[in-house]
Amino acid sequence: MPSTMIPAGYMAKYVARKPEWLQAPAVQDIYSVSNCVSQAFADYINFWKHNGYWLFDSPDIIRAVAREQSVLLEGTSLFYYEAYEEEFDDATWHPYAPEPSFQTNVAVPASRRLEGLDVVTFLARNSPECSPLSCNGLAGELHTNAHCLLPSFEDAQASVASGRFNNSEPGPYRIFAVYSVEWS
């Protein structure tokens, strides 16, 4: 993993089993950053408690939002994300930053398990939009793990730079490390 991965935040998600239409035999479930297949715990953006990456700075903030909005977290899995400091658009890598109007102060978990890397579209340049590995079925063309994620940063970066994501959703594309975290 490159040293340029930045703590981006947390999300509680309802992990979906592999959809029948996804032609990727190794995939069992979807740990994507996007909410297209595995849904977030709530339609959280309207609560305005997210950070500049449109994720949450800590699990405690997710719990507080769920409590305030009477949303049950039962059945959700907790994920922590780190983002590569550059996004890919127009055939080159460019630096980007979190949305500055939101405070971003991510609490890095003491314990986490790397599940793989996801490539996520950010056409509007704020919140995660689509994960083409699951949303567009690219997991059927690229080597992914049981969670529909790429096995390494190098695989993700090379796949993006070589144009493997070009015919999916419009970019820019950002690379995220996806970690499982235990609810404590």
Region locations from a protein language model:
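Short aromatic-glycine-(Arg/Gly/Cys) micro-motifs in beta-strand/loop hairpins
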Residues: 2-52, 99-145, 171-179
